[in-house]
Amino acid sequence: MKRILLLLMSVFIAAAVFSQDRVRAYLVSNAHFDSQWNWDVQRSIREYIPKTLDQNLFLLGTYPDYVFNFEGGIKYQWMKEYYPHQYELIKRYIREGRWHVTGSTWDATDPNIPSAESFTRNILYGQHFYRREFGVEGTDIFLPDCFGFGWTLPTIAAHSGLIGFSTQKLMWRHRPFHGTSKIPFEIGLWQGVDGSRIMAVMDAHNYTTKWRYEDLSHSKYLQDIAQSNPLNAVYHYYGTGDTGGAPTIESVRALELGLQGDGPVEIISATSDRLYKDYLPYSSHPELPVWNGELLMDVHATGCYTSQAAMKLYNRRNEQLADAAERSAVAADWLGAVPYPREVLTEAWKRFIWHQFHDDLTGTSLPRAYEFSWNDELISLKQFGDVLTTSVGAVSRGLDTDVKGLPVVLYNAAGFEVSDVVEVTLPLEGSKFTVYDDKGVRVPSQVLGTQQGQTRLLVEATVPAAGYAVYDIRKGGQPKAPAIKAGAWGLENSVYKLTLDANGDISSIVDKRHGRELVAAGKSIRLAFFPQNESYSWPAWEILKKTVDASPQAITGEVKVTVAEEGPLRASVCVERTLGDSRFRQWITLREGAQADRIDLVNDIDWQSSNALLKAEFPLSVSNLSLIHISEPT
């Protein structure tokens, strides 16, 4: 009897010790799906959406332990619109917890170019769609293939109620960034700029991993990775990319075999958030390391933030116009002028923010893809513009515009009072005008020109935060003499004296208030030309360090400087140059009044150079750290 008891006790003790020695492997299936890249959205909908649906529905129906993770609200929307039968089938698997809605966003956004408002709305619209369609919400940021991750990501994610983040892209780095490692750790906590924290998997391993048919519970590979970190756990993608689809049948069979295995690795067929939930609350796990900083790339990020500049322009204009439209619409609704256009604004936001996808806004898709991207961007601009015009017009009709001359209503969408020089187009011709504010005080103005019964007029105006101001414009009066000096030598107003060199570059800016030179000694503010960027594998992604370390060429061909505009409120010079077959026109502008301390440089470039770079250089003698500063590795 004693022998039996001793034997049982030894078995129990051995089992307990074995259990503690086991490591965990969270195997996270995925079908990485670039909405656009080397194909356009039409092909994604026609080929890659049905492939993803059919292959995963087969696996889900055949292998009871298979769990599939898939992200991107816009892709689910395409499923609903174009493949309604399969869409209804995946709803059942979502209810069963086997098809997992991951990522939380409307699409897998680039986290660096979009504004914080856009990033937040990407999550907002994704979550709203998931709640409405499936009765669930995502809990994580799932970005296997993005080109670096800004420090704001964990803050935005945490304030959106999300708990985790994963990627595998950081291992693409060329150089180590953290001692001898490319990442600060494999699994831990990432702290945002405000102290918020989410769990972060910084190396989830290759998302196209395919398992061989073997008992994964005995995998030395998984065991070694898990034992290399203090959690004794590994989070590992497996599946396919970049055109959707599903993991291989052999991979899923290996997963099922491993789930039944008795080896030192506990296999978990995991949703993308299972690891994060297992470690909540994070404050109870002091073994989790913490990273407090950015996660940047030295490859696949150094060029894509300048590629396809039109996309960046349209995106930023949409972000700005969306904010203005939203503010004006809320005020108009509150004042009873016009109902709040919720559906129009939501549609416009969703139409352009899916193009913030990491191969779209970044400029790394093929040219045909941008025909669809630009189209959507322009439609959203039109929708936001219509909302802004309608809302401002409705409120303006209720304002007191009983003035002696022509009333002009100005609207300020910013959340603070703005004093600026405003350009107004009047429906009448004239060479002399006087302008008065709502208190009857004359304000500075400047006629720019007349054409076809209209006059372009500059007015120095002040408009309250998110508010309106009425100005009275009358014909006649004595125009003021120009207060800004302009010539081929440069420009001068009450704040700055700006001098051009023989190339038309800005060689000096003297701040007259403080008697200080703002341009670094021996330098000039200029356009600089780099003739070769020898990135042949990833030309849209990369600007090589050796390219920008080289000395650039000055642009000095056929330099011509003319005075483009001169008046009491604004003056500008136009600098024309050539380099090879490329032609450059640059307008340098100074103002007077509230914006006298502002210098504008606007470039119009006919670019005829290939495999080359153009850089705007601003070598200043002063710096502004603003709120925080970030130390970068050299």
Residue positions per predicted region:
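Alpha-helical scaffold elements lining the catalytic groove of polysaccharide deacetylases
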Residues: 111-129, 204-226, 571
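Sec-dependent N-terminal signal peptides
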Residues: 4-13
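Residue-level detector of conserved catalytic or cofactor/ligand-binding positions
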Residues: 626-634
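Catalytic and substrate-binding regions of extracellular carbohydrate-active enzymes
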Residues: 342-346, 354-605, 610, 616-617
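Surface-exposed loop and adjacent secondary-structure segments within mature catalytic domains
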Residues: 89-97, 117, 150-209
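N-terminal catalytic cores of secreted or lumenal carbohydrate-active enzymes
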Residues: 20-122, 129-132, 159-162, 189
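CE4/NodB-like, metal-dependent polysaccharide N-deacetylase domain
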Residues: 119-151, 156-159, 220-237
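Active-site and substrate-binding clefts of carbohydrate-active enzymes
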Residues: 26-34, 183-402, 411-413, 438, ...
